[in-house]
Regions:
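Short glycine-rich, low-complexity/disordered patches
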Residues: 42-56, 100-112
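Active-site acidic/histidine clusters and adjacent loop/turn architecture
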Residues: 1-54
Length: 130
């Protein structure tokens, strides 16, 4: 089971505080869940690097930018490692390299952080292959 950082969203209104602070997974493709489990397995096998993570972004369209790919049916998620270091971010990105079309560090606004610098990096944005 892939851990999720927050409760499911109760509504989808962009500027309504009742619809904030949530993470949806309904509508994620099965392949995306399978890829996340593969990443979990990779992290479990690491002896020197604790790269376990939680899912922090899924299909909650209303919490992302207007042109977001975070939508039901899309293989797009955000993850936050339990240990937030540059080495862990890069390790997860490298581990997912064969099954993603996009794997990058982003800040809390969804802006790309090229070097995965800490503390600027807030999460990893993954767009998995179909």
């Amino acid at each position: 089971r892939v851990p999720i950082n927050k409760r499911p969203c109760q509504c989808a209104l962009p500027n309504d505080s009742r619809c904030a602070n949530c993470t949806n997974v309904a509508g994620l493709p099965k392949s995306t869940v399978d890829y996340l489990r593969q990443l979990q397995d990779y992290c479990s096998d690491q002896e020197t690097l604790d790269c376990k993570f939680v899912l922090s972004g899924g299909t909650e369209t209303h919490l992302h930018s207007e042109n977001t790919r975070h939508r039901p049916g899309n293989p797009v998620v955000d993850v936050v490692p339990n240990t937030q270091t540059q080495a862990v971010y890069k390790s997860l990105i490298n581990a997912a390299g064969g099954v993603t079309t996009v794997a990058r560090c982003e800040n809390e606004k969804g802006e790309h952080i090229p070097a995965c610098s800490v503390p600027q990096t807030n999460h990893i944005h993954f767009e998995f292959r179909w």
